[in-house]
């Protein structure tokens, strides 16, 4: 009888050990994608792209090469398109966006774009053209300035003080981001990664301060990339921080850096 008890105890210990080892293995796989796997390649590609953040002086883009596909002409140095936009919809109210896009032409070493304010209709999710405001801007000496007279001093000041996320965002701890959800489409090619962030994350704190985001909900980070995973050059990089996402209530921030053919 004593022998059977010892045997049963031994079997229980073995089963428990195997179970714990299995859990640890699954945890390691979720937190740290296996080296050489598609997930690891995606994270490595984003790591290379995000390593350029921040670029405080936008004029540095004039000397930065990007991923070139078949649409680029041989003599075209390409254009960087950078965008940053905050989207807010308080509960039960209209969705409003405000942001800027800038075309940085490497051929002419000039940069121009728009500062845009929009309202989004809840019925069809389209821009209400009657409520859209668009102001032309240009970059001179790493400063954004309006190209036309603006009577609204508040908007004028907002334009002149505007900073793109690429100028202050910092992903030095990206390698420590765990439990990512990955997807990959080799045909396009496009790929993505999603992470749950914490409120003490540097970028989260920056966005809360700059855009007066009062909610205490922890945001999700969605990264979307385009181009060859094995190529170190940037083709397209989209970043989205989602703070609130509910029917009739939304707060999220969009940022993108894209290398496109010059027009």
From Swiss-Prot:
It is found in: Cell membrane. InterPro entries: Csa, Csa_sf. The keyword Membrane applies. It holds the Pfam family DUF576. Its main location: membrane. Residues 1-22 form the signal peptide. A lipid is attached at residue 23 (S-diacylglycerol cysteine). Keywords: Cell membrane, Lipoprotein, Membrane, Palmitate, Signal. A lipid is attached at residue 23 (N-palmitoyl cysteine). One of its GO terms (cellular component) is plasma membrane. The keyword Lipoprotein applies. It is a lipid-anchor. Belongs to the staphylococcal tandem lipoprotein family. This is Uncharacterized lipoprotein SAUSA300_0415. It comes from Staphylococcus aureus (strain USA300).
């Amino acid at each position: 009888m004593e022998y059977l008890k010892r045997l049963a105890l031994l079997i229980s210990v073995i089963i428990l050990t195997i179970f714990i080892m299995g859990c640890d293995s699954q945890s390691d796989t979720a937190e740290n994608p296996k080296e050489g796997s598609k997930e690891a390649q995606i994270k490595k590609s984003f790591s290379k792209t995000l390593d350029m953040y921040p670029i405080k002086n936008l004029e540095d883009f004039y000397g930065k090469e990007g991923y070139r596909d078949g649409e680029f002409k041989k003599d075209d140095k390409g254009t960087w398109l950078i965008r940053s936009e905050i989207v807010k919809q308080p509960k039960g109210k209209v969705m409003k966006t405000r942001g800027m896009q800038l075309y940085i032409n490497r051929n002419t070493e000039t940069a121009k774009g728009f500062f845009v304010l929009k309202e989004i209709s809840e019925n069809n999710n389209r821009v209400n053209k009657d409520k859209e405001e668009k102001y032309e801007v240009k970059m001179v000496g790493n400063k954004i300035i309006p190209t036309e007279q603006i009577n609204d001093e508040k908007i004028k000041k907002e334009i002149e003080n505007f900073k793109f996320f690429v100028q202050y965002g910092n992903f030095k701890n990206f390698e420590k981001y765990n439990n990512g959800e990955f997807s990959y489409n080799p045909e396009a090619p496009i790929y993505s990664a999603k992470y749950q962030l914490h409120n003490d994350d540097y970028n989260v704190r920056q966005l809360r301060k700059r855009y007066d985001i009062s909610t205490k909900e922890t945001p999700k980070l969605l990264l979307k990339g385009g181009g060859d995973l094995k190529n170190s050059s940037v083709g397209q990089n989209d970043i989205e921080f989602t703070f609130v996402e509910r029917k009739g209530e939304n707060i999220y921030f969009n940022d993108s850096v894209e290398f496109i053919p010059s027009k």
